[in-house]
Amino acid sequence: MSARKGKTERRTRETSVEILLNIDGTGKFDVECGIPFLKHMLETLSRYSEIDITLRAEGDNDHHIIEDVAITLGKALNSARGSAPIERMSTRTVAMDDAVVMTSIDIIDRPYAEIDCPDP
């Protein structure tokens, strides 16, 4: 099987984001985004998922950078997987250092879900 790699760029008036990733990597990362906590989270994602991530992001404020990194990361993951099947959803709970981490991921390609639930 060939390596599953994705490269995506996003440029707006507020941000510039470039991501290169390899789903079949070893967890190597090179992240420059100017936001220490976002960098930490992306490096942690890379390390534990073993997805190689190279990322460059800059922008006018943290909110726009985080938002556009998320959009670009999702597009790069979608591009990298190609037609190869991968799990769409996953939930994990992990004790890590002095915290319990709970996460759920759904990599469907839709911006939101709207559900009309009547009051009981």
Task: Mark where each language-model region is.
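Structural preference for solvent-exposed beta-strand-turn elements
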Residues: 2-120
